[in-house]
Amino acid sequence: MVDHKHLNHVKEKLLENNQKYEVSVEDIQKAIDEANPKPQEDLDERKGYRLTWNHYHNLDDIYDYLNYLEVIFPTICTVSTIGSSVEGRPIKLLRISNRNPNNKAMFVEGGIHAREWISPASVTYIISQLTSNYDNEASYIKNLDWYFVPVLNPDGYEYSHNVDRLWRKNRAKNKISNCVGVDLNRNWGY
């Protein structure tokens, strides 16, 4: 992928070196916009929660869905805030549990990379399947405490929805440079 500001330079270098090239997508932003149309009309008609798996959703829709599940399935679902992002957004966790104190834990997170929208969608789909079929699940599923964090990087996720679709990192400010953001799963001390 080549930024339009550098396109002529790249073309010249390719031609100088007798390299063939083909433009696959003329306007990547247009292709991105067409791939994820605004789902507002689809959502306005819905009763209950606003989440579908026909579109990618913003952070508010995902958090509203978690809160909805806590109301609909109060015996198994609990929502809590486990922290906040650098911009002050809550990081929400959904626990699905039969409340057996002997249960082992299963932790599932998504949305660590802002632009990978399929990750929160996959996590919320798993949540949907687990909650809607919980009574029929096998004991090895029900005898776990499930902990889901659908969006571990809420600032980056919202930024990728509203400003820069290809943004990957969080939105942390760097004190010694103008570089914004940290790639969260590459910033561990080990």
What is each of the regions a protein language model found here?
Residues 1-190:
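M14 metallocarboxypeptidase catalytic domain recognition
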